[in-house]
Amino acid sequence: MPSYLSFARFYDGLMQDACYEKRCDYILKLAESFGHDMGITLDLACGTGTLTRLLKKRGVDVFGIDYSMEMLSEAMQSASEEGLDILFLRQKMQSIDLYGTINTCVCTLDSINHLTKIEDVAKTFDRVGLFMDDDGLFIFDVNTVYKHKNVLADNTFVYENDSVFCVWQNTPEDDNKVKIDLDFF
């Protein structure tokens, strides 16, 4: 996944407004509303592991999977710096292979949208289901076609904070896809 080679070192700076604490709270409250015990939890497409670390700090038995070695390197370094013992694995979403079962899987920040073929989405759901306990819970989010057509569309966004300056340019493509070009300075 060459597109993530330089992206990993800027990712956390770019995602400062992602409200990870609120996402973590929401996930835990959602599970609670279903009377669900998080149990062993997979953070699928964990990126730099920010949510993974927050879940761990809240007492969740969590591990992370991502395909980008660069993202995983950032995740492992951050977990180590925070004194957290978290397993991170390099695997593709659509072909995860685990040694046991999970009770919960979370996949946030529109990571499912990075799968551009419906077959890969189906494979991902099948693989998660294969390793999920019978009473398991899969929590994920996606961008909608509406967002792709009306928000991202043919727009350019500029993000600037203390750690990154990014120009985000969207180009609509066929089949409700959007090509995204990111330039970092």
Q: What does each of the following model-derived ranges do?
A:
Residues 139-185:
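SAM-dependent methyltransferase
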Residues 122-134:
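A short glycine-rich, Lys/Arg-flanked "PGG" loop and its adjoining helix->strand segment in the class I
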Residues 1-45:
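Conserved class I S-adenosyl-L-methionine
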Residues 97-104:
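A short acidic, Gly/Pro-enriched loop at the edge of an enzyme's catalytic core
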